[in-house]
């Protein structure tokens, strides 16, 4: 990537907008692609994304664009902040334009039909692209408001990691690198499920002991599942694992937490999602994770319990009673780290 080339951000949501602004603050020309011409015009005229980051001033170096072809042709470094459900349909027609380019996924989700992570879908669509992911305890509004933040860029491509670090690293945003792309991305996707549970617990005033128990048992479940799929367990002790889990399960700014909180207040799932007005990836992830955990025979009682509440007609009190009556096992599973870097 040359200094003259603009950096592309695909997606007009809160996180894509925060990253676009951050890139601009670091001196890059940024082209942010979005589907909605009205949204693009609002950003162009008012320098604000009113739907997703209201009150945040968007820098003049960020150019909102609706012509995807032009954006892809002009950029070598492309951050992909598209909803998991839209990634294939948006990018599949543009394979030739993406070959050899650096594609960095910002989306924390899992494809329902295949249980593939976003970077795996990118690899499938564009085998000749250079693929990475960015994940960590990164609430979009806090990034935009310059709260001190750290994240992880993960790829087997060391040069890509260095490019992303150089592009994003700044006064309030620190970028670490990892070669465990699968583990980093899986951590970002799985924690969304547990944020829904945490939001419900807060709405029901369950107490600090309960919240602490939920977060630590969630980390155990996440790690157990991830290791069964080949991830490095040590990744889950870092920013993309426990770091992301803590912030997502503790902050009312988290979209998945907000859905859980609304459910705890008595709203239906449809009502909670409608109130949010954005995609909450944890709801979709829960469905596919429950099936996958059964398929690979990994014990995930919190996942099973939340699924029972949202999709099987069970009440929260029934699920809590079943969870507390289950036989307690070891606190921390022993996982050999032999063979991991």
From Swiss-Prot:
GO cellular component assignments: cytosol
Pfam family, one: NAD_Gly3P_dh_C
GO molecular-function term, one example from the UniProt record: NAD binding
EC number: 1.1.1.94
Superkingdom of source: Bacteria
Binding residue positions for sn-glycerol 3-phosphate: 108, 136, 191, 244, 254-256
Binding-site residues for NADPH, renumbered to this chain: 14-15, 35, 108, 140, 255, 279, 281
Active site: 191 (proton acceptor)
Keyword list, A-Z: Cytoplasm, Lipid biosynthesis, Lipid metabolism, NAD, NADP, Nucleotide-binding, Oxidoreductase, Phospholipid biosynthesis, Phospholipid metabolism
Enzyme category, top tier: oxidoreductase
Reaction equations catalysed: sn-glycerol 3-phosphate + NAD(+) = dihydroxyacetone phosphate + NADH + H(+); sn-glycerol 3-phosphate + NADP(+) = dihydroxyacetone phosphate + NADPH + H(+)
Pathway: Membrane lipid metabolism; glycerophospholipid metabolism
Main location: cytoplasm
BP-aspect Gene Ontology terms: carbohydrate metabolic process; glycerol-3-phosphate biosynthetic process; glycerol-3-phosphate catabolic process; glycerophospholipid biosynthetic process
Subcellular location: Cytoplasm
Function, in words: Catalyzes the reduction of the glycolytic intermediate dihydroxyacetone phosphate (DHAP) to sn-glycerol 3-phosphate (G3P), the key precursor for phospholipid synthesis.
Family as reported in the entry's similarity comment: Belongs to the NAD-dependent glycerol-3-phosphate dehydrogenase family.
Protein name: Glycerol-3-phosphate dehydrogenase [NAD(P)+]
Source organism of the structure: Pseudomonas syringae pv. syringae (strain B728a)
Gene: gpsA
């Amino acid at each position: 990537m040359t200094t003259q080339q603009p950096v592309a951000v695909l997606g007009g949501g809160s996180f894509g907008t925060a990253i676009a602004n951050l890139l601009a603050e670091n001196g890059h020309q940024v082209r942010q692609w979005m589907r909605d011409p009205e949204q693009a015009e609002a950003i162009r005229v008012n320098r604000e994304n009113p739907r997703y980051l209201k009150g945040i001033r968007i820098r003049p170096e960020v150019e909102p664009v609706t012509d995807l072809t032009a954006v892809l042709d002009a950029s070598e470094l492309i951050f992909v902040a598209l909803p998991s459900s839209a990634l294939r349909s948006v990018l599949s027609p543009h394979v030739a334009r993406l070959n050899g380019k650096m594609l960095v996924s910002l989306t924390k989700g899992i494809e329902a039909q295949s249980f593939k992570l976003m970077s795996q879908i990118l690899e499938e669509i564009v085998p000749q692209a250079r693929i990475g992911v960015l994940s960590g305890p990164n609430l979009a509004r806090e990034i935009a408001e310059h709260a001190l933040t750290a994240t992880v860029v993960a790829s087997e491509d060391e040069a890509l990691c260095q490019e992303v670090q150089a592009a994003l690293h700044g006064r309030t945003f620190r970028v670490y690198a990892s070669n465990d792309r699968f583990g980093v991305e899986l951590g970002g996707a799985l924690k969304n499920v547990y944020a829904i549970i945490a939001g419900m617990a807060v709405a029901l005033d369950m107490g600090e002991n309960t919240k602490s128990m939920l977060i630590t048992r969630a980390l155990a479940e996440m790690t157990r599942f991830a290791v069964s799929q080949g991830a490095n367990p040590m990744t889950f002790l870092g920013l993309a694992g426990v770091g992301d889990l803590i912030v997502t399960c503790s902050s009312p700014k988290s979209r998945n937490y907000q859905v859980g909180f609304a459910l705890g207040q008595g709203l239906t799932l449809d009502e909670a999602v409608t109130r949010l007005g954005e995609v909450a990836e944890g709801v979709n992830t829960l469905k596919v994770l429950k099936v996958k955990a059964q398929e690979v025979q990994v014990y995930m009682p919190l996942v099973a319990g939340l699924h029972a509440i949202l999709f099987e007609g069970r009440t929260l009190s029934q699920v809590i009673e079943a969870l507390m009556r289950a036989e307690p096992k070891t606190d921390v599973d022993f996982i050999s780290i032999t063979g991991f870097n």
